[in-house]
Amino acid sequence: MAAQVTPELANLNSKPEGGAPPKQVPVKDVPENEDVESDDDNEGDQGAGEPGSTGAAKKKKKKKPKKKKKGGPKVQTEPPRVILSSIFPNNDYPVGELVEYKDDNAYRTTNEEKRYLDRMNNDFLSEYRYAAEVHRQVRQYAQKTIKPGQTLTEIAEGIEDSVRALTGHDGLTEGDNLLGGIAFPTGVNLNHCAAHYSPNAGNKMVLQYEDVMKVDFGVHINGRIVDSAFTVAFDPVYDNLLAAVKDATNTGIREAGIDVRMSDIGAAIQETMESYEVEIKGTTYPVKPIRNLNGHTIGQFEIHGGKNGKSVPIVKGGDQSKMEEGEVYAIETFGSTGRGYVRDDMETSHYAKVPDAPNVPLRLSSAKNLLNVITKNFGTLPFCRRYLDRLGQDKYLLGLNNLVANGIVDAYPPLCDIKGSYTAQFEHTILLRPNIKEVISRGYDY
């Protein structure tokens, strides 16, 4: 649930796949460590009593049995359904993109104390890399298969079913989703809608060829959240819009680092994005950063970093605070052909329990019961109405609205620019490790 809005705006079943069995495809970047016995030493073996032999029959050379391959299967299916721990049985998940610190922080790459501190974070890194590899495999399949004519519900649930399968947490038993799985509702945001749109039950909206769709989803293992997003467009007329935002996000990632000021990152992002323009139906539009959407810190089980969370602007000015060692950030940028400013619009689907929610006596029994379900299944992780439906909850809207009214649950309505405009988004999660920056969600796709 990547988008974090500026304060002024903030105040305003897993289903089995039918048809043929899943296709198996190789998993990229998986090291092959198996030792397979060569068959070369069987060459030239001769059977006993061959024609023309004059002596005793030659003894047949004993074949050595081939060693069994170690570990689990080395392939993923299409759609992704193989739990990742069976593909990486030793929890040796792929490393993200490693970027050495520069300038005054260049010493961190070789400093022994920093390297020692980094080695202490093995569990932290393993959980993050697990979540990141799930994200990569799920999104890369989604990018290949998302097509015009699909409903937004089909797209969102396809992604969610894959995340649940690869993490091994279907979220149907109490507390299971807190161990791992979906970190927040899958955003499938069309055109002028930039963020926080996920279909509610009964939604029949269909993806069209001329649409620009932002796909934003999160994966977590033990509350270590990987937040990453990409944009899908079928008409090449939007290529420059997507290129502008992807370039701006990569600029933000490049500039981010320990002791870097947030305002400096925002200025660099804005300069990059505004260097692009896009022509649509004969009209040329400058690509504008959406100035009231930001990147953000990520905390354990808290997508926006909790009480002491920080924002990463995508325009110049503003926050003078600095990034610090050990922090986790979602670096995301949004570009628009509209005003470059979003407002709440359309029906709400995203909700999250407030981490330090007030202890308010609830009069509605439906609100009390729903709060218990939310706490035990999502904690402070965001959820949507479809997830409550999936848990068998019904007639819960009155109770949900009561929790929102009492400040116990926050509602996150869709965030939209002016109608007729087009918006794009790209996002990655980065770890500011003591000795190196790791773009944990980086893949060959973006």
From Swiss-Prot:
List where in the cell it is found.
Answer: Cytoplasm
What cofactors does this protein use? Co(2+); Zn(2+); Mn(2+); Fe(2+)
Q: Which domain of life is it from?
A: Eukaryota
> In this UniProt entry, which cysteines form S-S bonds?
none
Q: Which GO terms describe its molecular function?
A: initiator methionyl aminopeptidase activity; metal ion binding; metalloaminopeptidase activity
The cross-references to InterPro entries, in alphabetical order and at most eight, read:
Creatinase/aminopeptidase-like (IPR036005), Met_Aminopeptidase_Type2 (IPR050247), Pept_M24 (IPR000994), Pept_M24_MAP (IPR001714), Pept_M24A_MAP2 (IPR002468), Pept_M24A_MAP2_BS (IPR018349), WH-like_DNA-bd_sf (IPR036388), WH_DNA-bd_sf (IPR036390)
- Where is substrate bound in this sequence? H196, H304
Assigned keywords, A-Z: Aminopeptidase, Cytoplasm, Hydrolase, Metal-binding, Protease
Q: Which GO terms describe its biological process?
A: proteolysis
Q: Which intervals carry biased composition (Acidic residues)?
A: 32-44
EC class: hydrolase
- Catalytic reactions of this protein: Release of N-terminal amino acids, preferentially methionine, from peptides and arylamides
Entry EC number(s)? 3.4.11.18
Q: Entry's NCBIfam families?
A: met_pdase_II
Please report which protein family the annotation says this sequence is part of: Belongs to the peptidase M24A family. Methionine aminopeptidase eukaryotic type 2 subfamily.
PANTHER family registered for this protein in UniProt: METHIONINE AMINOPEPTIDASE 2
> Which protein are we looking at?
Methionine aminopeptidase 2-1
Give the organism's phylogenetic lineage: Eukaryota, Fungi, Dikarya, Ascomycota, Pezizomycotina
